[in-house]
UniProtKB/Swiss-Prot annotation:
<dbReference type="Pfam" id="PF01351">
    <property type="entry name" value="RNase_HII"/>
</dbReference>
<keyword id="KW-0255">Endonuclease</keyword>
<dbReference type="InterPro" id="IPR024567">
    <property type="entry name" value="RNase_HII/HIII_dom"/>
</dbReference>
<dbReference type="GO" id="GO:0005737">
    <property type="term" value="C:cytoplasm"/>
</dbReference>
<dbReference type="GO" id="GO:0003723">
    <property type="term" value="F:RNA binding"/>
</dbReference>
<dbReference type="GO" id="GO:0032299">
    <property type="term" value="C:ribonuclease H2 complex"/>
</dbReference>
<dbReference type="GO" id="GO:0030145">
    <property type="term" value="F:manganese ion binding"/>
</dbReference>
<dbReference type="InterPro" id="IPR012337">
    <property type="entry name" value="RNaseH-like_sf"/>
</dbReference>
<keyword id="KW-0464">Manganese</keyword>
<feature type="binding site">
    <location>
        <position position="10"/>
    </location>
    <ligand>
        <name>a divalent metal cation</name>
    </ligand>
</feature>
<keyword id="KW-0540">Nuclease</keyword>
<comment type="function">
    <text>Endonuclease that specifically degrades the RNA of RNA-DNA hybrids.</text>
</comment>
<protein>
    <recommendedName>
        <fullName>Ribonuclease HII</fullName>
        <ecNumber>3.1.26.4</ecNumber>
    </recommendedName>
</protein>
<dbReference type="InterPro" id="IPR001352">
    <property type="entry name" value="RNase_HII/HIII"/>
</dbReference>
<feature type="binding site">
    <location>
        <position position="106"/>
    </location>
    <ligand>
        <name>a divalent metal cation</name>
    </ligand>
</feature>
<comment type="similarity">
    <text>Belongs to the RNase HII family.</text>
</comment>
<dbReference type="GO" id="GO:0004523">
    <property type="term" value="F:RNA-DNA hybrid ribonuclease activity"/>
</dbReference>
Length: 191
């Protein structure tokens, strides 16, 4: 009998004003799930930046396979955030070394571009370690990219808010204007 393979899937950066939306996909076996839970894995939003960074090498080492996908700010503006998020998720899944039988997707976003089985799970990172692991990988990868972009655009304070719509970020956009990495469709009420 063929083993049933499930991939956890989560997105990061959906509500940001700057930069791409990222998605992580992770396939774990039961032993890897237990090991990650013992190491403190949970929803990336409930972990410190240091804890997330420390978990990444372990996730990559013991997962059956993992991948990250993204959609650019330009794609978000052209396609809308829903479709761009779906594209990032599909890209992550297609980059997996093994294609899963089912996707376990955090939230309520059904993937129209995926023709296999899928299950959306509200608060999925609290229920499925593979979703939590995908969340951590995507969050660390996106934050690292945005922090590198902070060096190119220091006036926006990106290292502090990683592109989200804080008062500091909104004030910087009002003062300095938008960059090519800002999501134009998200800025209509700021400029």
């Amino acid at each position: 009998m063929k083993a049933y393979t499930a991939a956890g899937l989560d997105e990061v950066g959906r509500g940001a004003l700057f930069g791409p939306v990222f998605a992580g996909a992770v396939i774990l076996d039961n032993q890897a799930e237990d090991q990650l839970i013992d190491a403190g894995l949970k929803d990336s939003k409930k972990l410190s930046a240091l804890k997330r960074s420390n978990l990444v090498p372990l996730i990559k080492k013991i997962s059956h396979c993992w991948a990250i996908g993204q959609s650019s700010a330009r794609e978000i503006d052209l396609l809308g955030i829903r479709n761009a998020t779906e594209k990032a998720m599909i890209r992550a899944v297609h980059r997996l070394e093994k294609q899963p039988d089912v996707l376990l997707i955090d939230g309520c976003l059904n993937l129209r571009l995926w023709h296999g089985e899928q299950k959306t799970v509200i608060k999925g990172e609290d229920l499925y370690p593979s979703i939590a692991a995908a969340s951590v990988l995507a969050k660390v990868a996106r934050d690292d990219l945005i922090k590198r972009m902070a060096e190119k655009y220091p006036q926006y304070g990106l290292e502090k808010h990683v592109g989200y719509g804080t008062a500091l970020h909104r004030a910087a956009i009002s003062k300095f204007g938008k960059t090519k990495l800002h999501r134009k469709t998200f800025l209509s009420k700021i400029q």
